[in-house]
Amino acid sequence: FGTHRADVANVIPPQRAGAIAAAAGVADRSGWCPIDPVTLESRLRPGIHVIGDAAIAGAMPKSAFAANAQAKACAAAVAALLRDAVPAEPRLINTCYSLI
């Protein structure tokens, strides 16, 4: 990165899924977790579902609103899978506002 001088600096490290995702074997080389878009189940470790910032979820941003929508879709998918039913394809949406 070189040498930088600043009176105030906001340093943000490279982002990736949390250490628990790597330890569970659900994160790939990108540092994120590839998922099935219908069930939100890990493509690397079947039986583990990943939501929120850790998930590679298409065009969904890394936001709490997106994670909330993913959580509801994931719960519905898990409930369907437990009944041996085919999960419905979720219609994930996002609303994100920045007041800055």
Residue ranges and their predicted role:
Residues A54-L92, S98:
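A conserved FAD-binding loop/helix module that cradles the flavin
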Residues H4-A69:
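FAD-site-proximal beta/loop scaffold in flavoenzymes
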